[in-house]
Amino acid sequence: YGATILADYTAPSDGSTQAYVTYIQNFSTSYPEMNGLLMSSASGGGGETVLNTLKSLVDPGTIKICSFDTFEGMQEGFNDGWLSCLAGGIEIQALFDFVMLYNAVDGHPLADGYTVLYQNFIFITSAEDCENYSKYISNPEYMIYDADTIQSMTVRYNPDCTLKTLTDIMDAYTLESVVATATE
């Protein structure tokens, strides 16, 4: 993609966000040409800390953040030009893991042996995406899948259910599909 890695850091695992402040201050001083940050995780206060640190060091949009995970203030971050992309939405993975377990315990395993399920990320690239993400995906009051869809993933309620039934539902999971279903 034409990116040049100028430096890297290890995200703190102790819950402290001060290390983020130090890293970002050092990077912006050592690499004034730096125009982006790729964060492998913005959870645990990392996203908020990096964004606030950048705000104190450079003009909006000078250094853009692209990250896995979502965080408080992301909508404002897009509006103000600090963010270019966030990847999230994997909270739903637990449903598919549970469905695999449920079918197996119910005597109808969907696969022989160990199976890897790949969950789509939801890519957020604008403030509007943030609004929809917050309203429909990270909102515990909203059900992404209704009872009929969940039952369709089980052999007990859908004798034609297969692993492909489940993976087709997983593959169709996008921000656009969730919003379309919600607004029908």
Language-model segments: what does each one mean?
Residues 1-184:
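A residue-level marker of the well-folded mature domains of exported/periplasmic proteins
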